[in-house]
């Protein structure tokens, strides 16, 4: 039975690497795989999924207007892999859930669970609601513990606690942290207090 799977982690855990490895495994066995990534993430170029290890592969892009229905699938598609799935709209997650169950094509979405303030992305919240299976990828905090939170850094490397939810960046902009380090940091304390108020 095909299903919708959400593979999530904090920043820099290797989600894109895992997606690219999964794509390679299908292709190596002579199967067709379709890849999608968010159009707003152009760090590696438009329609390119690149891991921090340097491997990359071209992909179709999605934006807020993309409709995920049977028309996006090639006749022989064995699997649909979506990177940066936190940027999906909830209606798109519903479409993907429906597509997985009506097309018999497994759909695997890779993305962040929460933003730099610990708030859910709309796409991630919908995936946590509708996905049939979940896989958490382990990221490591600077203290060595499991990182589940993301902190945003400014140009000087200082942590910030305000700003737009979406600001595309990699290692220069974000750091994965365990919850303890996230909340002990002064910016995290300010956010926790403002959220509680």
UniProtKB/Swiss-Prot annotation:
It is an enzyme of class 2 (transferase). GO terms for molecular function: ATP binding; thymidine kinase activity; zinc ion binding. The active site is at residue 84. GO terms for biological process: DNA biosynthetic process; thymidine metabolic process. It is found in: Cytoplasm. Zn(2+) binds at residues 141, 143, 178, 181. It catalyses: thymidine + ATP = dTMP + ADP + H(+). This is Thymidine kinase. It comes from Albidiferax ferrireducens (strain ATCC BAA-621 / DSM 15236 / T118).
